[in-house]
Amino acid sequence: MNHPVMNVSGAERGRCCASIHHSLDICGRSDCFWNCPSFEPQFPIPQRDLEKAFFLETSGARNVNFRQACAIESLALMNPHLTVILLMSGKDIDLESTTMKTLRKYDNIKIYVIKLGDYFIHTPLEQWYFCSTWNYGPYAVSHLSDALRFLTLYKYGGYYFDLDIIMIQPVTHYRNFIGAENENNLAAGAFHVDYLHPVIRMAVEEFRDTYRYVR
């Protein structure tokens, strides 16, 4: 069965010269012809001493649905001193939809669009993003979401929550935790790490080194 290929933003990055001193691209292929372009951060980088939490919308949707908006709103309401950040991968975000307009009313909710190619540059997952086959097959969005949640906390520290988790109490007294799926497995739907915590670097590197494409 043929599956659609998820577009890799900034795909030219995978073919540019990794160094001015040789003609290999970042994927190790020869005969590259141009230097890798520079890039600029796409949104204000959160202060590293700021309490923050991240949600990710990686399907390319223009907005979040009502259930997802409730999850974001509940976290902001229960934790007024927490900066709640929604990162979206879509290219045409509808900030005038009912859900997005509601979220934008909160001072502690920030909504940013990320350009995926730039987000992975100069990180341990750069080659994974540009050189592996993660974007083929039926699980591309899921694989991208897994990579982004680990990479985001690797870059900034803080909390990560899936968009189907509703908060009924404050969370900021929980630190450096991850939920359990069962007695043998951990779940990556809710976790926290302090900035530069060694565990998150280990998680990112293990994801990179053990990733296997699943048809």
Regions found by a protein language model. Name each.
Residues T83-G90:
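Short internal beta-strands
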Residues N63, K91-T98:
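Short, charged/polar "capping" segments at the starts of alpha-helices
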Residues V199-R215:
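Catalytic core and acceptor-binding pocket of nucleotide-sugar-dependent glycosyltransferases
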Residues P138-L186, A190-P198:
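GT-A fold catalytic core of metal-dependent nucleotide-sugar glycosyltransferases
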Residues N63-H81:
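Histidine-anchored nucleotide/phosphate-binding helix
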Residues M1-F55:
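Juxtamembrane luminal stem/stalk of type II transmembrane Golgi/ER carbohydrate-processing enzymes
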Residues L95-E96, M100-A147:
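Active-site-proximal specificity loops/subdomain of glycosyltransferases
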Residues I45-D49, R104-K105, P170-V171, N182-N185:
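Extracellular/periplasmic catalytic domains that process cell-envelope and extracellular macromolecules
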